[in-house]
Amino acid sequence: MKRALSFIAAAALSFAAAAQEPAVKVLAAGSLRAALGDVARAFEASAPGRRVELGFGASGLLKDRLAAGERADVFASANMEHPQALADAGKAAPPQAFASNRLCALGAAGFQATPQTLVERLLDPAVRVGTSTPKADPAGDYAFAMFERIEQAGHPGARQRLADKALQLTGGPNSPPPPKDRSVYGALMAAGQADVFITYCTNVVVAQREEPTLRRIEVPEAVNVAARYGVTLLHGAGEPARQFLQFLLSPAGQMVLARHGFAAP
C-alpha cells in the first residue's frame, strides 16, 4: 500500500513539475500566425504539461530584437538569412528549413488582371502596388526580387519603376500595428490602401477568407520567387523547446503546415 501511495505521489509531483515548466517562447513570422498556432496546439496536446507562447511580427524586426538580447527559445523566420545571422553572431544554432511559400497578387474587388496580364497591370502608372517593407520583412524582399525578375523577363527599367511606386504598407519599424486577430493584408485592401498587394499565397488565402470580394491572381512562374522558411533554437533553450522544434519538423507538424498552404522546404 505504501509503495502504491509513493508511486501516486511521485507521479503527481512529476505532473505538477511539468505543468509548472516555463512555456516555450516562440517568435515567428507573421505569415505563420494561423499555421503555427495550430502546430502549437497539436504539440501541447501531444505533450501534456508543455506550453507554447507565440509572438509574431516581421522576421527582420524579430531578428533585431533577438540580436539586441530579447529572450526566446525558438525563432521561425520567413527566410533563412535572419536565423543564420543569429547563428553567425553566436546566439542560435544553425537554422533548418521547415517550409516554403510563393508569391501571389491580392487584388481589390475591382482590380482586373489575369496571370497573363498581371505584369503589365503592375507596370501601369495608375495602379497602386502594395508590398511589405524590404529588409524588415522578407515578404518585401521577395516582392522586390520579383520586380528584378520582371525586368530580366524583358521589361527594361521595370525593377526601378516598380520599386519607386511600391507602397510599403506593412512590416516596417514605423508601420501601423497589424489589427488583432485579423489579416493585415485583408484590412489594408478593404481600406483601399492599394489596388493590388504582392504577398505570400498563404496570406492571400487568409485575406480572402476575411474579405471574400478580394481577388487572387497567380504570379507567373517566370517571375515568381520562392520563400524558404528557416527555424532555429536560441542558445539557452531547454528540452521543451527542442521537443517543439522536433515536432514542427516531424510529419505531424508538416501536415499542419500543409493544411495552411505551406509546401515542404
Label each region the model flagged.
Residues A10-A19:
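Hydrophobic h-region of N-terminal signal peptides that target proteins for export
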Residues Q20-A47, R51-G60, D64-A68, S77-M80, ...:
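Exported/periplasmic ABC-transporter solute-binding proteins
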Residues M1-K2, F15, F56:
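Intrinsically disordered, low-complexity proline-rich regions
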Residues K2-A10:
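Sec-dependent signal peptide recognition
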